[in-house]
Amino acid sequence: MTVSAAQSTALNWVETARSGLSQDCARIFEYAEPAWREYKSAAWYVERLRAEGFDVEEGSGGMPTAFCAQWSNGDGPTVGMYAEYDAVPSNCQAAVPYAAPRVGLSALAAGHTDPHSALGISGLGGLLATKAAMETHGIKGGLRFTGEPAEKVRGSKPIHAAKGYYDGLAGMLSFHPFYMLPMCNTVRWETHCGAAYSMIYRFICDEPHLFGATDGAPIPQSHSDIRAPGANDALVMMYAQARMLRDTMLPHSGGWSISEAIISTGQATADNLPAGLAELQYMIRVPTVEMAQSVSARLDALADTVAAQTGCRVERHWVCKSRPGLANHAMADLVWEQIQQVGAPVWNDEAKYLMRKVQVNCGMSPNDDPVLPACKTLIAPQDAEAILRESLPPNQRNSTSDDYTDMTCHAPTARFYMARPALKGGPYPAWAMNALGGMPQTIDPMVQAASKVLALSALRLLEDKDARFAAQVEFERRKDDQDIPPLCDYPAPIQFNWPEYSETARGHDWHIPTSDAS
């Protein structure tokens, strides 16, 4: 497999930048900001990209923690890459081989799980290596790099897609750290991720005086008077009844799921006033848009019913409406060639020592070589596809969930996975994987490998007109077969009570205050 001169330059750039990329990854891991609240992370990327010569739009798509960076080396094709950087509440873990939250916080604060800290820096490494090679070898064309907040709620990409940020690309390169077998050190072939709808039901009790009023008194005079049940009761009823009815919402096939999260509840302490506000978020992950619409209709009807029973009104606010993904074999083949060139990540003795420390601190017997075997080998896309299809109905096109799928509807896209550090044995507590994703010795090998694959793939697209043509022809054919227009018809849901850090007289903390008992 021949490597071009430009690709060799990119590989050398990534190697030379090893220390800097490691420090950058550790910085974003430490920020660990959750969905829609990634202020420091987004600002860091914007500053860095501008310093590297990119034109950067902050707040792209109406999302304060999103951005779109562009750079051109003259007329030619443009290749897209991106960063994610949102963390997950209740996963706060320091970059150490034992269970410990980051300094000054409790385990309830946010932390990187899969980890998006390394996903984003891998994207940045691939981007800057490509730029360096384009400049050195006079390759014409451009690079577009988007900052994608709130992936954990499939937030930004449907919005960016609807507003045209992925239009006009010769190709989009989508990387994610491995999180499920057999998708490790490989490329998705035919079965891409599915659709997802997410919404917040906001129950509002702002006219409690109309519920059960009988004596004309301006307010209830005692705790024993009739009072509106209020927003908390509406939320509890919605939560419980939706769970009871879940099995009746869709046929029992396709690997769909419905999950929920309580965003806000009433503010009263021990008062006997009805709660004025409660918010419940649902995430519906399904193979098709039609399935998502069916579940949404059932939840809408249920929300109306419980609101009427509790003296409330209800509002539905969209968090995401995301389309299923389109495959592109030409792009998959192109990226698979680069994965074979780079190879799987390699962990040295120091990394394996830390992995064994994690095993011991999880109560496991340490392995001489603790690395999960799948992390050290490559698997061909067609072989991974065959394993994936074993548990799916033959007529099912899409499976599992991630919002990169909206990119596939606008540009030829390859979705690939490189091994993050994972251990033999188990099961392991969440802190173990989170720690492995934060310790530089264990996560840097993945960042190096993914950055190289991204750069080699981007340069292949830029240098090979035939490869671009094949990818575009297949994209147009598949889009004609399954053309779903953007579903996003809502603003970014940034105004809700999403988990976040706070600054008070007590200092910097999580919105749930840290205490010795937490």
Predicted regions and their residues:
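Acidic/His- and Gly-rich active-site-bordering loop/insert found
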Residues: 3-112, 117, 121-141
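A generic structural motif
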Residues: 87, 207-209, 284-291, 322-323, ...
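An extended, acidic, His-containing surface patch that forms the Zn2+-binding/catalytic region
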Residues: 322-518
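Acidic-enriched catalytic cores of C-N bond-cleaving enzymes acting on peptides and small amides
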Residues: 214-215, 221-273, 288-317, 325-372
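Divalent metal-coordination and catalytic microenvironments
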Residues: 28, 49, 69, 81, ...
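Glycine/charged-rich beta-loop-alpha catalytic/anionic-binding loops adjacent to active sites
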Residues: 97-113, 215-220, 431-440
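Buried hydrophobic packing segments
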Residues: 45, 122-130, 235-238, 242, ...
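Histidine/acidic-residue-rich, glycine-tolerant segments that coordinate divalent metal ions
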Residues: 88, 103-108, 117, 133-259, ...
